[in-house]
């Protein structure tokens, strides 16, 4: 009953999203609240949010498949699948933000070697192929087994994903295939580390090289993006594993490991944030300092103090500290960060547009499209929520057809011997 209600609600949200996207594509950018001065809005916020979730989740998966940290083995599949679907969501958001989304292929045909954006597109394609290939090597045995043991749509879906692979009859051949899969996953994971760093670090670089926006124009910006990605990825894994991944009610060692990782990443992110704000507030140039004042004390002060400081830093650390490994509190800590990171992404994008480049520019013209103010309208919210609903619906359907959540440890061997464990101590 609950499952039926869940899919009904998701389907309704997805339909609303499809309608909103049709309006966006048919009417163009005029349906948004964007202005000539505030040209990036809610869609870009969600774009960097989901790209960060993807990069963070993938980098966590490398702990299992590259660095042999077997205590994280139970989230290996989950990390790869969330990396893939988060990437899809991020690319869809940036696609609808384009003035002419039908021209997206121009970036592939008309390359500009000196353009960060051009290189970023190549990284996205390579990154996507690496994730898909790693998932296939990880899951090909299960795809083949489920293609034989299931019926209907599940059977067809899994048989298609096998790409013709069949499970060997002999145990010796099966072990050889598993060793080969492990070998290829390690190779792909190693290649994926610089690619994932390039994907989200490159996204940060797109902001960091914009000289006209002093708030972004810094060598620290790509680093902030990367650390924030690790925070969001660890938080998403903690949330999903706590509530859906078969975690024990109390004392699950993986929960404690994820909690320790999340706390570590939050600490690094906090250090970078303090450095950024201290330097920014010390700036003697008024219009450059104005952005930081707006974040801290402006009309939307609560996005920073409640969203970033409260939900991303104070609340999760408090919950992890008092949880003593309890599944509910650890899951809520992860959820708090996952939701709060949206506020972090908002703060990264929107405040950069509040300060005119020179005095009087904000009042020189009288037009709703020439304002240094931005608030997403109803269609922007409905298209965003609907698009998220579409991606979550696709992910949920995949979970029904493919065993994404591991209830038991996966079997991976290196030359027939167990891989050594590496532990993170709190």
Swiss-Prot record:
Q: What is its main location?
A: membrane
Q: Which GO terms describe its cellular component?
A: plasma membrane
The UniProt record lists the EC number as 1.97.1.14
- Work out whether the entry's keyword set contains Oxidoreductase: yes
The UniProt transmembrane annotation reads 5-25, 40-60, 78-98, 119-139, 187-207, 223-243, 261-281, 302-322, 330-350, 385-405
The record's section on Pfam families has:
NrfD
Q: Does Transmembrane helix count among this protein's keywords?
A: yes
User: Where is this protein localized, as stated in its record?
Assistant: Cell membrane
Q: Which domain of life is it from?
A: Bacteria
Broadest EC class assigned to this enzyme = oxidoreductase
Membrane topology per the entry is: Multi-pass membrane protein
Reaction catalysis annotation: selenite + a quinone + H2O = selenate + a quinol
UniProt keywords, alphabetically: Cell membrane, Membrane, Oxidoreductase, Transmembrane, Transmembrane helix
Regarding protein family, the annotation reads:
Belongs to the NrfD family.
The name this protein goes by in its record: Selenate reductase subunit C
**Could you tell me which species this protein originates from?**
Mesobacillus selenatarsenatis (strain DSM 18680 / JCM 14380 / FERM P-15431 / SF-1)
UniProt lists the gene as: srdC
